[in-house]
Amino acid sequence: MKKTILTLSLLLFAFVARAQWTLQTCGEYDYTRTSGSSASLAFKGDCQLADNFNIGLGLQATTLGRYSLNLQYQVNLFKAKSGTLYLENRYLYRLFPNYKLQEFNALLDLGWRNRHFNFQLGLTNRYTAPIPLRKNGGMDVTFEPMNITFCVEGNLFDQEHPWNVGGRISNYRDFVIERFTLFFYSLNGYYDFGNGLRLTAEAGVHPCGVLNLSAQYNGWFGNVGLIWKP
């Protein structure tokens, strides 16, 4: 039994060691009339385990006292010269200690991407509960069974070009999922330094409010990050 466990462990280690890793860190500044100024720091890692499968994990902390954990994976379903059809599944957990609340999100969508464009359409649900969890639920527990998610983004060049600019419209980002009618608009770009190091930047506007409650005006955000492919 011990030999079997050791053999399986070595095979798993060898499999993961051969995988292609991507590491990313990103700092962001955000301003809204409801919350004022805030900053956040995020760390993300992606692992390409096979040609048609990758898995990613992300962590974010903000000066407003919000903490987020994002786990996701993608599976390529079909490849053609015109693009790739893929399935994405992500799970997002957000913690709001100041409000004594926590939020669980699950998202499943289909996507189509090619050298210049990416389009995704899917469904998500959300479960919000107090801290600590109550065994019998209660009036403070809410469940949103279905919400439509979408993302449309395009780039001037393909992803192998040494620099690029593009735009994105969606109702979700790595660490937040909004309702279908609340959009994020952003412009983004990157520059490759070589040796697997890439500088990224993004600026955009987004809905105001907290805990997915919207206001009648927008806030804005900007971020700068580094991506490293060992």
Give residue ranges: language-model regions.
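Transmembrane beta-strands of outer-membrane beta-barrel pores
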Residues: 27-33, 59-63, 75, 91-97, ...
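Predominantly the C-terminal beta-signal and adjacent terminal strand-loop region
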Residues: 171, 178-230
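Sec-dependent N-terminal signal peptides
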Residues: 4-15
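Short glycine/proline- and aromatic-enriched beta-strand/turn motifs that initiate or cap beta-hairpins
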Residues: 19-64, 227-229
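Flexible, solvent-exposed loop segments that connect beta-strands
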Residues: 87-101, 129-143, 175-178, 211-214
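Residues that define the transmembrane beta-barrel architecture of outer-membrane proteins
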Residues: 35-41, 63-69, 85, 100-106, ...
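Outer-membrane beta-barrel proteins
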Residues: 49-51, 70-80, 95, 108-116, ...
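Repeated loop/turn-to-beta-strand initiation elements of outer-membrane beta-barrel proteins
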Residues: 21-23, 50-57, 78-87, 115-121, ...
